[in-house]
Amino acid sequence: MFDIGVNLTSTQFAKDRDKVVKRAREAGISGMLITGTNALESQQALSLARQHANYCWSTAGVHPHHASEWSAETAATLRRLAESPLVVAIGECGLDFNRNFSQPEQQVYAFNAQLALAAELSLPVFLHCREAHERFITILKPWLPSLKAAVLHCFTGARAELESCLAEGLSIGITGWICDERRGQELRELVPLIPADRLLLETDAPWLLPRDMRPRPPSRRNEPCFLPHIVQQVALLRGDDVDELAAQTALNARALFGL
């Protein structure tokens, strides 16, 4: 099992990060990708990856919520971070028109800039899209021939959106959203449509604690050690063997990020 989406820089992990990693190892997680969401957190993510070398890797990027912070200095910082072999993707980048913490045009500018950087550095992209699919694909598509690989993290969209992403060759990240019988019902029906070699799994910890976990942790905080629960649910929905799915998705992650 490999967790492709861990927000280990979150203050929710401030008091016990090492224990979180230890619990992940004990749960059978073979590695994890620490997400960078702005310049500072991308630096912190790389620092954490260095502390857990050969087990953790990181991304360097600016989440659409932080797109208004984009500057020439930001680009220079990401470029410098990406010199480390532990930085294996540019992102989390993309569009989020759900709440528009940054204006749409700021998001578009930062997204294009990061796609250009990923193409230049021959790195995969770790993508985010929420309520912006048409614009997202329109921007992304011309870059795809120049990109090493692309994964749309935490996919929660509709069938047409999944089919569109698959048609463009994207890999798909699935989280504990699949474990929510209310919000995740459509996703539960779609997950069998994802080709086995393009499926990746993630917790998005500390967010998205699987709703059907029993017992629930008192903190209600998600952790990478809960990834086996997501693997079990995805395997059940796809009719896959749990161990085979765990191995296949870990292989997919290592192949996509060049580990």
From Swiss-Prot:
Entry keywords, A to Z: Cytoplasm, Exonuclease, Hydrolase, Magnesium, Metal-binding, Nuclease
Claim: Hydrolase is one of the keywords in the record: yes
Question: What superkingdom does the record give?
Answer: Bacteria
Query: What EC number(s) are associated with this protein in UniProt?
Result: 3.1.11.-, 3.1.13.-
Location in or out of the cell: Cytoplasm
| Subcellular location, principal | cytoplasm
Identify the Pfam families for this entry. TatD_DNase
Recorded GO molecular functions are:
3'-5'-RNA exonuclease activity; magnesium ion binding; single-stranded DNA 3'-5' DNA exonuclease activity
> Which terms in the GO cellular component ontology are assigned?
cytoplasm
Q: CDD domains recorded for this chain?
A: TatD_DNAse
Q: What does this protein do?
A: 3'-5' exonuclease that prefers single-stranded DNA and RNA. May play a role in the H(2)O(2)-induced DNA damage repair.
Protein name (database record): 3'-5' ssDNA/RNA exonuclease TatD
Q: Which gene encodes it?
A: tatD
